[in-house]
Amino acid sequence: MNTQDSRSKKWRVVIPVIIIALVVGWYWFRPERLVTNRRVDEAFPAINDSATQILESGTFHSGTHPTEGTATIYRIENGSRVLRFTNFKTSNGPDVHIYMVAAEDARDNASVEHAAFVDLGLIKGNIGDQNYTLGSDLDLAKYRTVSVWCKRFGKNFGAAPLMPAAQLTR
């Protein structure tokens, strides 16, 4: 067997392996999400403002990525509860979820990793107003913080510690 044939066979194996590694790496890290934004502008679900009650609210602070805006929990006219983000902005990323965390605050990754949490689902957008429905069994006395959490990399993009409405007016 000559050297030319062995090199040719080697490249027939190496090139597909490189292509597969690039595709898997792109899928895992999703580098395009670092430079793209997903804007949302969801309307508030309440029809009758007089029947809407603020239960809790808090301001986002940055974690591993700049994060800003307000998180407010409302009880709306049908009795359901809604978590609403207003003036919200954070970085985009792969597999970013919204968590309700059983902690007073979540300033680092460990404070989310070592606490109980409820996953409200994938983030709807990294910029803009958005709503998340809260289950009727979610104990707001226990779950005191909203976290923007990247499941893929275990990173807390930012968090909003919540205060009861009675404390907000003081």
Model-derived regions, located:
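N-terminal Lys/Arg-rich, disordered targeting/topogenic segments
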Residues: 1-9
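Hydrophobic membrane-insertion alpha-helices, especially the h-region
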Residues: 12-27
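Transition segment at domain starts
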Residues: 29-78, 112-118
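Short, surface-exposed binding/anchoring microloops in extracellular/periplasmic proteins
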Residues: 68-95
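Beta-strand signatures of extracellular beta-sandwich domains
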Residues: 97-99
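An anionic, turn-rich surface loop/hairpin at beta-sheet edges
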Residues: 108-136
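Short, exposed beta-strand-loop hairpins at the edges of beta-sheets
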Residues: 135-159
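C-terminal end-helix/capping segment
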Residues: 158-170
